[in-house]
Amino acid sequence: MQGPHAQMTDAAYEIRRSEIAALSTDLAPEDPIPVVEYTEWEHEVWRTVCVDLTARHRTDAAAEYLESAEQLAVPLDHVPQLRDVSGRLGSISGFTFQSAPALVPLREFCGGLANSVFHSTQYLRHPRSPFYTEDPDLLHDLVGHGNVLASDRFARLYRLAGNAAARVHSTEALQFIGKVFWFTLECGVVRERGERKAYGATLVSSYGELDHFRSADFRPLDIKSLADVEYDISTYQPILFEADSMDEVEDTVGSFWDTCDDDSIAALLGGTSRSVTPH
């Protein structure tokens, strides 16, 4: 991103990010989402990324993502207030947002999903790197997750992931549920008319990921195969799993989350512990 805001120092950015995070540090679930007075550089980052992503989505995003995004109609020309988007999303699919100061622990995050609540940050990525961030930010949470949560199918899948996490007790089982979430709802790809299209939130909210994802090593979507693949959120994904249709995603992933428990996941993992870093 060119312009004066691209020269913002790391120290100034961290101060601003901390200011926004502090607004939600002590919020109770029933408290209203804070209103953030966004600065011009934040609006500039939002506009720059959204304009470029919208163009890329026409060729690279799955049809169901595009339809859902059109329904939610997140503004492209300014940073929206999270509480406004939350209200609109709630009227569409029943999901709402809860403001979070940063990435929340996986069990807490999934607990929200079970109750149709998505924890979202309210700060934006550094203006020096607007097209990719390894940390979740408002762009990732709204353009990536918010847009698909306006789809009834995706809203069901997110709830199923949350309910699955609530059923399990072992760390290994919880982490594996998180891994399935990562390779589908974060980094999922589907074939449409012979072309690979992205539907995962990490892919559709990152120009860099959309540039890179078709060069990945693609494997058929299979829950057992996921157990043997690790991931690193700090880089573009070298391995992705693709489905032949969104119905296959719903059948494969939805059925797993709907029925899994500690024992079935332990059997799937072969009794061994595999450590992953949840996003």
From Swiss-Prot:
It comes from the Bacteria. Fe cation binds at H140, H145, E186. The record marks C187, T202 as: Important for the regiospecific hydroxylation of the phenyl ring. One of its GO terms (molecular function) is iron ion binding. Its cofactor is Fe(2+). GO terms for biological process: L-phenylalanine catabolic process. Gene3D superfamilies: Aromatic amino acid hydroxylase (1.10.800.10). It is an enzyme of class 1 (oxidoreductase). This is Phenylalanine 3-hydroxylase. Optimum pH is 6, and the enzyme tends to precipitate gradually below pH 6.5. Changing C187F: Loss of hydroxylase activity. Only a small amount of 3-hydroxy-L-phenylalanine (meta-Tyr) is formed. InterPro entries: ArAA_hydroxylase, ArAA_hydroxylase_sf, Aro-AA_hydroxylase_C_sf, Aromatic-AA_hydroxylase_C. Signal peptide: none annotated. The keyword Cytoplasm does not apply. Tetrahydrobiopterin (BH4) seems to be the physiological pterin, however the hydroxylase is also able to use 6-methyltetrahydropterin (6-MePH4). Keywords: Iron, Metal-binding, Monooxygenase, Oxidoreductase, Phenylalanine catabolism.
